[in-house]
Amino acid sequence: MNRISPPAARRNRAFGAIRWVWTAPTTLIGHATARLLGCRNPQRIGGQATNAWLFRLPAGRFKGWRAVAIGHVIIVEPAFLAEHGRWLLAHELSHARQHDWLGPTYLPAHAVLLFLSTVMFSFRPVAKFSPWHAYNPMERVLICVPVDVIADPPPPQGALAESVLRAFGLTG
């Protein structure tokens, strides 16, 4: 599939404070989760489209973990990040953009869709995709960088792909 779309830059600074308040509860949950998992020293990542705090899980722990965006916090397993690099970060930053729109409803909405995808997957599996991603529109359709770029390589290339990575501050 690999239908990527370049995200629009967040230009309007007037709404920045409103966006911060709107996204703060979920982002605070993300920071607390990262700390509880033993993550330290977050790195600020992102570009014109959005930004987030990147936490790496402690080496050797939580090996089954992959990556999750909780508000404007991204928690990744280092080996998974090394394997998928900037497209993984672009996908997770795309979730941060979803969070800008949905605010405190983001986590419950995503949880419901993860559950429904898992139920649908039990009746009709999709090769290369996990149960929680296969039928989840927040993972595959309503997102700038769908999980397909990670689950079904090779990742996109060309001018469009570079413009998407540039919008997320992930070039060179």
Spell out what each predicted region is:
Residues L37-N41, H91-R97:
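Short charge-dense sequence patches
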Residues L93-A111:
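Catalytic Zn2+-binding segment of zinc metalloproteases
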